[in-house]
């Protein structure tokens, strides 16, 4: 018998959103990818790296990427670590701060991959639910677990916790408070300033969503230098290849392109939300590049299948607390108009 660790043998593993073999055959609104291509400067930077240099190892520290992020966010480079997607940062935070048997916690519902990463480490998982007005339910005055993950804006719902509340949490969490800002660029709010004020605050970011680089796997964390030093100890030593590093620098450097893409997505999101309400769908006001919406009959599976039959992919969760609704990524205006036409047909 294969001698798997007990915690690995009993875990189910994370199930990502459906990826069709031919994405071009669908309107793909199920994994919160950006509706628009990356900046042309990104493509130029990648092509400039293709050639003789590929036989050489990349910069193990991703210094150019750290410096670009530091300039953008107003930190010194030693406060930044670059990663193979923000998932690598989340994984390494648990490896660095949670021993086997320690507790980590997160908001439910949010990114269930936190639980998967904790299970790999052998840590215990606790979740805190939400009240009807999007507050944390039954959260203690002092949380003594090793890490508390806060996705802001929340996914799948899209609402945001206020900066004041996040600062309050920083004082109530004894361990590390990790603010996962995967979708923060669509909201305009950030907790980055709290990193300077509280030694236990880490902010994670990704270039997958707002910078259109999901296919490159690029993320980063902003934290105190001593936290970054710990993450540097355990990350893969060549975690970003040459192409990814070049893409990161170019993407972060082209803020005009970035801002225009975000503007168009937010504008389409607000239009789509208003159109859904005309069909009597309930829509949670969203600060991400997606909306969580519930049809009048609360049968999310029925609407999901109707859209799937029309080659429109959205996200339906089997979780009974989410199965009544759908999370729909925001595509181009044309894609969302076609989606609305399909929803009118489905009824």
From Swiss-Prot:
SUPFAM superfamilies (alphabetical): PLP-dependent transferases
Residues bearing the modification N6-(pyridoxal phosphate)lysine: 209
Keyword annotations from UniProtKB, A to Z: Amino-acid biosynthesis, Aminotransferase, Histidine biosynthesis, Pyridoxal phosphate, Transferase
EC number, as in UniProt: 2.6.1.9
Catalytic activity: L-histidinol phosphate + 2-oxoglutarate = 3-(imidazol-4-yl)-2-oxopropyl phosphate + L-glutamate
Xref: PROSITE patterns: AA_TRANSFER_CLASS_2
Name of the top EC class for this enzyme: transferase
Superkingdom, taxonomy of origin: Bacteria
Molecular function terms, GO-annotated: histidinol-phosphate transaminase activity; pyridoxal phosphate binding
Cofactor needs: pyridoxal 5'-phosphate
Pathway membership, UniProt: Amino-acid biosynthesis; L-histidine biosynthesis; L-histidine from 5-phospho-alpha-D-ribose 1-diphosphate: step 7/9
Family annotation (HAMAP family): HisC_aminotrans_2
Family: Belongs to the class-II pyridoxal-phosphate-dependent aminotransferase family. Histidinol-phosphate aminotransferase subfamily.
Name used for this protein in its record: Histidinol-phosphate aminotransferase
Protein species of origin: Geotalea uraniireducens (strain Rf4)
Classification of source organism: Bacteria, Pseudomonadati, Thermodesulfobacteriota, Desulfuromonadia, Geobacterales
Gene symbol of the encoding locus: hisC
């Amino acid at each position: 018998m294969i001698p798997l660790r007990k915690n690995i043998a009993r875990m189910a593993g994370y199930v990502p959103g459906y990826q069709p073999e031919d994405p071009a055959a669908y309107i793909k609104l199920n994994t919160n990818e950006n509706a628009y291509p990356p900046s042309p400067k990104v493509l130029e930077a990648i092509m400039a790296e293709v050639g003789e240099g590929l036989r050489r190892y990349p910069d193990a520290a991703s210094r150019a990427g750290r410096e670009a992020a530091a300039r953008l966010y107003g930190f010194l480079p030693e406060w930044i670590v670059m990663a193979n997607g923000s998932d690598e940062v989340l994984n390494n935070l648990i490896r660095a701060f949670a021993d086997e048997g320690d507790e980590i916690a997160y908001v439910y519902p949010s990114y269930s991959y936190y639980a998967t990463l904790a299970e790999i480490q052998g840590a215990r998982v606790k979740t805190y639910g939400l009240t009807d007005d999007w507050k944390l339910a039954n959260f203690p005055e002092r949380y003594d677990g090793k890490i508390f993950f806060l996705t802001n804006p929340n996914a799948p719902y899209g609402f945001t916790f206020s900066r004041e509340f996040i600062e309050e949490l920083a004082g109530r969490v004894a361990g590390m408070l990790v603010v996962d800002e995967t979708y923060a660029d669509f909201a305009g709010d950030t907790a980055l300033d709290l990193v300077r004020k509280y030694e236990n605050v880490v902010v994670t970011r990704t270039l997958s969503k707002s910078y259109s680089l999901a296919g490159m796997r690029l993320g980063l964390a902003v934290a105190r230098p001593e936290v970054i030093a710990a993450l540097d100890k355990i990350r893969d030593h060549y975690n970003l290849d040459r192409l990814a590093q070049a893409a990161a620098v170019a993407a972060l450097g082209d803020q005009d392109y970035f801002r225009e893409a975000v503007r168009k997505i937010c504008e389409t999101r607000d239009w789509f939300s208003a159109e859904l309400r005309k069909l009597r769908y309930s829509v949670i006001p969203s600060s991400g590049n997606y909306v969580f919406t519930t049809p009048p009959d609360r049968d999310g599976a029925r609407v999901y299948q109707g859209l799937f039959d029309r080659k429109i992919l959205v996200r339906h969760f089997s979780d009974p607390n989410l199965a009544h609704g759908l999370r729909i990524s925001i595509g181009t205006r044309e894609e969302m108009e076609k989606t609305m036409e399909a929803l009118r047909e489905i009824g």
